[in-house]
Amino acid sequence: LGEPQLSVGIKRIEGGAFSSFALGLKPADVLQVMPPQGRFTAPIGGRHNYLLLAAGSGVTPIKSIAQSVLEGEADSTVTLCYANRNTESIMFRQAFDDLKDRYLTRFLMTHIMDEEAQDVALFNGRMDAEKLSTMATRGLISPMDYDAIYICGPQPMITAASEALTVLGVPPERIKFELFTPSSPLPIASAAQKPSVARGARVEVVLDGARRGFAMEAGDMLLDAASQSGLELPYSCANGMCATCRCKLSQGEGEMAQNFSLEPWEIEQGYVLACQFKPRSELVVLDFDAV
């Protein structure tokens, strides 16, 4: 919000495909980009009180949320807890310092480090369930007072934080998260564990008001089959993490290979990830226009 140009945050990860590629970029190199997508955003307008939890490079979308809320909502407050190994590994350190100076009464930031000692013992170590519970007990955070809590980082940190917040009484719908480095998928409904249909399937897709169909072979992922048939469906990570390819199964049956982003209630209502979906009936209808 309010920035004159597109910017991205990249943190080098050993063996990381994109970070390794990005290190080789030179001035004047041209990249193709897509418009911002995904659901990990905060609505701008009104008055809100947000808690943001981030670890490592997971702070990238968190920074955008904090900046957009502070700039776009004059009466809103943002509390950020940011976990890193040490001071040198902090991303956007100067940008966060500038936000603190600009919004003295509305932006509170706490650093948590596991390889560098700080004056307050509580802020040493990892951001785990025990630490968040202790911070709540001491009044450093007030989980029940936040309109929403946004979490981004490695899956163990997200799982621990979500569980701690749930124990503290935060309703699940107020806890929003985005995975950067998954280690194991979220649970998938047991009905989705049946084998995929032995023969091929007919797939019909509703996208932008139009209905199109194609045939796919048994064992193929829907997103791959659609691409092979010349149909472009919305997607980004293709790993089940971002939910850009989220759609609703309105007819037929199918299974997801893995799920890192859909909540249990979404699965119960029939939502699936196209990049992880395989039919297990001879006809399936998927609606990408379903909200």
Language model: regions and residue ranges:
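Short, Lys/Arg- and Gly-enriched loop/turn segments at beta-strand edges
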Residues: G38-G45
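Ferredoxin-reductase
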Residues: L1-V30, M34, H48, N84-T87, ...
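A short, charged/proline- and glycine-enriched loop
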Residues: G45-Y50, R199
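Reductase modules of NAD(P)H-dependent flavoproteins
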Residues: E88-V291
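Histidine-anchored nucleotide/phosphate-binding helix
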Residues: V59-E71
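Short, glycine-rich nucleotide/cofactor-binding loops
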Residues: Y50-T60
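Structural motif
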Residues: N49-L51, T79, A148
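Short internal beta-strands
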Residues: L6-G9, S76-R85, T110-M113, K176-E178
